[in-house]
Structure formats: C-alpha cells, structure tokens
C-alpha cells in the first residue's frame, strides 16, 4: 500500500523547514512524492501599486520562495523516480495578459511556475520529476464555501501527477489533467 506523511511547517521559516526535514529524515530514507501546498492570499482587491511591501514580501516568501527552500532542503531524501508537485494557480498564468486578481498572489504563482521549469532542468538528470498544478477554485479555507470545486476534484490532477503521469512529463503547468500554456 501507499503510506503518507503529513509534515506541517511554516515555509516562511528556515528553522521550521529544517525541523520538518529532521522529522522526515528520522522516519524515512526516501520520499516518493513531495507536495508543496503552502499558500496565502493577502492582497485581494489591491493593485501592485498599493499593496504593502510587507504583504508582497510575505506572499512571495510563503507561496514561492518557501516552496523552493522546501525542495532544496528535502533534496537529500529525493532520488530517481521521486516526484515533486508544486500547487500553483491559474492566477499565475500570463499568456493573454496578467491577472488583475490579487497581484502579489499572482506574481507568487507565476514565480512558482518559473521555478518549476528551472528545477525540472536541474533535477531531470537525477531522475526527479517536478510539475506545477492549478487545482482550480476549491472549497478550502482559502477558497471558501462559495468555491466551484470540491476538494476531490481539486486533488484529481495533483494525484495523477504524483502517481500515474509518465515520468517524461516534467517542468510543466497542469490543470484538469491537461498541460496549460502559462
């Protein structure tokens, strides 16, 4: 069977990431699937001109840079056949123009997609697969009760990427089991 481990951590804190790594490395020698699902939405209704520097910095730290630090820290537990899932958002899509929705959030998700491409280039020679995925607007704490998607529907593509997707598919952005030009 499949065994999972949930490691809560504050991805805005290097100490918290290192503590989570210590817990994981004490329990397992290898991670098959690493899911980066951290995210904050702090700037709804703002513009890039009027969002505070603190909110912009915190959003980038949590939504993108923290996820990068998790990958870098957990790399010793990843090996050939391991998969990394970066939970992103359609807000990070810049094809056809940038989103007017929550600019700090959108920037952070565009950065996550770009990091995914860079990491794929770096990790492919090691046999590690990485992709970013938009689960859509999901009924979670962030999405709220009015969101259009169930948690199960939002998890469909991340689970496919983690378990069934061909290993040749790496460095891409996905939504509803389809590669998205972002």
Mark where each language-model region is.
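A short, exposed helix-loop element centered on a Lys and neighboring polar residues
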Residues: 71-72, 117
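A glycine-rich helix->loop->beta "capping" turn
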Residues: 2-5, 23-36, 42-44
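The beta1-alpha1 cofactor-binding region of Rossmann-like NAD(H)/NADP(H)-dependent oxidoreductases
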Residues: 8-19
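A conserved hydrophobic alpha-helix of the Rossmann-fold in NAD(P)-dependent oxidoreductases
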Residues: 17-24, 143
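Catalytic loop of short-chain dehydrogenase/reductase
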Residues: 40-60, 80-125
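C-terminal helical subdomain
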Residues: 125, 132-133, 144-182
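Hydrophobic structural elements of the Rossmann-like NAD(P)H-binding subdomain
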Residues: 35, 85, 130-133, 143
